[in-house]
Amino acid sequence: MSFTPTDYNAYDFANRRHIGPSPSEMEEMLRVVGVSSLDQLIEETVPASIRQETPLDWAPLAEHELLARMREVAAKNRVMTSLIGQGYYGTVTPPAIQRNILENPAWYTAYTPYQPEIAQGRLEALLNYQTMVADLTGLPVANASLLDEATAAAEAMTMAERASKSKARAFFVDADCHPQTISVIRTRAEPLGIEVIVGHPAQLVPEDVFGALFQYPGTYGLVRDFTRDIAALHEAKALAVVATDLLALCLLKEPGAMGADIAIGSSQRFGVPMGYGGPHAAFMSCKDDLKRSMPGRLVGVSVDARGNKAYRLALQTREQHIRREKATSNVCTAQALLAVMASFYAVFHGPRGLRAIAERVHLNTVRLATALKEAGARVSPEAFFDTITVEVGVGQAGILAAARHRGINLRKVGRDRVGISLDETTDAGVIARVLDAFGIHEPAPAKVGLGFPEPLLRETGYLSHPVFQMNRAESEMMRYMRRLSDRDLALDRAMIPLGSCTMKLNAAAEMMPITWPEFGTLHPFAPADQAAGYHEAIGDLAQRLCRITGYDAMSMQPNSGAQGEYAGLLTILAYHRARGDAERTICLIPVSAHGTNPASAQMAGMKVVVVKSAPNGDVDLEDFRDKAAAAGDRLAACMITYPSTHGVFEETVREVCRITHEHGGQVYIDGANMNAMVGLVQPGAIGGDVSHLNLHKTFAIPHGGGGPGMGPIGVKAHLAPYLPGHPEVTGPLTGGHDEAADEGPVSAAPYGSASILLISWAYCLMMGGEGLTQATRVAILNANYIAARLRGAYKVLFMGNRGRVAHECILDTRPFAEAGVTVDDIAKRLIDNGFHAPTMSWPVPGTLMVEPTESETKAEIDRFVAALLAIREEIRAVEEGEIAAADSPLRHAPHTVEDLVADWDRKYPREQGCFPPGSFRVDKYWPPVGRVDNAWGDRNLVCTCPPVESYSIAAQ
């Protein structure tokens, strides 16, 4: 027998690892769809008039080649000890948390917990986070995270404006706030017509403002009591916001004790690496009467169908996708995974451990300050926690350079001062090197006292709930983390077919580099020459994204898709202002648009005009034409999603763009559905002027159970000068364009959550241009295969002119309402089959939107189809009168182990209820709770850890 080498490429990441169906399976699927080839399907799906002609042509890297390239790039970053502070600090990530949370797909591949029955684990972890924040800030209600401290401050400003009874239109900002926070607040305030007054608290005139923001401790270190300032604000019917530090609050008097209405900050130093700017979970807490005005997601306690304790997202009618143009915030993706990490850091250390860390950080700072003073240095402030500034006069540059020579970054403050912020990684050796940079060779004193007045010492306890007391041993921590993850359904268990969410594979090789210290320990404001590796990676990713989208420049700053929308609209408005067209403020948005679109437009100060949908789901072209003409020289932009939110490539997209440009507007193409376009259609080539990209959808960043995400924006060349800038960076922040942007920032850090950009870069490098295009084609195949398999059982609501859907399809479940079966019933019944429900009731109420992505195998898709077909038969039984809807397995879903072992008095067999067709028997996923009562949870709102008795009841 002669030897013939195989043509099988074992290292073909795109086709062997990322794309689910094999070539032979694709042939079967194409037959079901009714086409002879993938090329024919694409021709029938994507209009020829918009298809790109130039293919993406870079070669792919194998996984081992990718990791070698990453090592080379990582080596170009210089790992220094950064004592710059300014909201970013060195921290120790406990290996138990890194291994069991950050590196665990059970945690990082989950979706936002809108289906509470399959998200009890991460909901409990987020409730722990809320409890931690509420306890430490001394305020009763906290949310489940925001994007970063600066945007949290901006959200707090608009929240204060809504809630304040003052008629003033100005907001006071303490000059001791972090510079990036002040800049982001100015960016947010300008389009809303809010005047920002920056000054010393002594200059505050409470009657002139609706609210004020104080930094505690201040950016230059000052710790002071704001009780009197806050009382004066309240006397004038204004609200007080305190930006604070959770570690400092383990020692310092809490904002709630000062009378603060809102507290915000970052939980980064609770075990989350700096990552050159992120991702990190910001927090917000508030007084009870403000909770309904709070942005972001809020976890609450409710009960299930059997009366057992259950967690859920509370007060969801506050959210942007429901309120749309009436929304007060566009927060969607936040930072759930990082909030979970921070909550486990608190569980890991407990209150005594956190206080010990805070004491060590503070006393080390006192030692350093004392040594500097004894050597004759002028150190301020008198009261501090972990940050001091030293007056050095003309010697500033020399001291900064001497510190860098010793491996330490200090902060340049003005022209003649140096800032020093210590953290939990600071030891005696670091202090000695700092002193050496100042020419001081005497050791710091061993015994010192408090560095702030005793009245500022915290008097109240915190983290008294047993969850923060019971898990000291790592074995117990590991088991607690495992118990919580076992309660959830993430991509490591099953397909998550959420329409418009693109729950694709997050490959292990893509994830690995983010935990490397060469990427994790960099401070976002470190000298640029220390981040050469980051700049190479970010620049290369930006260039590739420009090639993919057809845009000329790419800003990597926005921290989420919604923030990308906001940044893109601000860019458009800045462009119009520069041309003398400041009156252009109208934004045309189709009624079917993503909920964040009108919310973002409202935040940007635009007037939203809603455009109708035609009967086939497309934008109503006549209505669009009429409203564009009516807007005339006041038209700023239109926002469209492509392919449409109805899952179709609309033939008229070029005409929509032409009409908008004809009236002087700019075209914003929402990139949420880019997974149907990569390699096939470039939004910048079909008339788009700006788009955001959801890197946590199309480009493989995991959803993390509700964040992190990234939403960079691509623009045509004429908009590039108006992209977001940053106060800490000079020079260009964009890829593909050499001009420095001078508009205000939208995020705290110059490149947003820079460390997770590495995931998308790795994805692009391993897939290669051809692999990225094939992924798009297979995503379209998988969606059309599902539509074909379900035809006859469910009506597919919208299709293109040739009967095809894009990368997702909408199943119409409204006809079943006549029999009393709801879309909720179908969603919960899918849990019994081990599936997360598709997107419910959006963009059309009473429907399910299904997006399988290219990563799902034919076997998994067939299992999902079998589940839906079995559910259709159960609906048919209700329709034909065999069983009432209220008595059916649909209404009792999901079924728990408690249901399985209880006395069975239901009108369908136990086997049918608990083991429906398509479900696994050996490895079956059992939801920990039955159907959750949402209304009960909102009527009886509890947003911190419930009493310990409820845990023991649940255990029994």
Swiss-Prot record:
N6-(pyridoxal phosphate)lysine: modified positions: 697
A cellular component annotation (GO) from this entry: glycine cleavage complex
Catalyses which reaction(s): N(6)-[(R)-lipoyl]-L-lysyl-[glycine-cleavage complex H protein] + glycine + H(+) = N(6)-[(R)-S(8)-aminomethyldihydrolipoyl]-L-lysyl-[glycine-cleavage complex H protein] + CO2
First-tier enzyme category under EC: oxidoreductase
GO molecular function (one): pyridoxal phosphate binding
Entry superkingdom: Bacteria
Single GO biological process annotation from the record: glycine decarboxylation via glycine cleavage system
Needed cofactors: pyridoxal 5'-phosphate
Its EC number(s): 1.4.4.2
Keywords of the record: Oxidoreductase, Pyridoxal phosphate
Function, as annotated: The glycine cleavage system catalyzes the degradation of glycine. The P protein binds the alpha-amino group of glycine through its pyridoxal phosphate cofactor; CO(2) is released and the remaining methylamine moiety is then transferred to the lipoamide cofactor of the H protein.
Subunit structure: The glycine cleavage system is composed of four proteins: P, T, L and H.
Family statement drawn from the similarity comment of this UniProt entry: Belongs to the GcvP family.
Listed name of the protein: Glycine dehydrogenase (decarboxylating)
Protein's organism: Cereibacter sphaeroides (strain ATCC 17023 / DSM 158 / JCM 6121 / CCUG 31486 / LMG 2827 / NBRC 12203 / NCIMB 8253 / ATH 2.4.1.)
